[in-house]
Amino acid sequence: MTEQRLLWGTGTSRTLRARWMLHELGLPYESRPITSRSGETLTPEYTALNPSQKIPALQEGDFVLTESAAIVNYLATAYGADKGLAPPTDVRARARYDHWCFFSMMELDANTLYVIRKHEDLHAIYGEAPAAL
């Protein structure tokens, strides 16, 4: 695959995931450093690329993939075999691999966002966080 590779987005942990994997794999790419909540994701150009208007987005030629975990898994599967980063092919081993991917997204990332939303100033963006029971 020799198509031009673009990574859209910067300044968030989610964009860092994709950027980190590109570096781990030694893959060349160009950066489009748009940020969230700046209006840059709302442009007609970016909306055509990613209708959800979120970052990051990976573009390889006509192929576009969004969601950081999907991007990381795609890159690992497509380019990671030589570096030992490709997901396992055995169904149960892959299930364990997926377990840790989903754990990091839901348990670590979601809880961090809740704490920040509850105790910092993200409530202005996302609304008040509900009280934990």
Language model feature labels by segment:
Residues 133:
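Aromatic-anchored helix/helix-loop segment that forms the rim or "lid"
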Residues 1-130:
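GST-like domain detector, emphasizing the conserved glutathione-binding G-site
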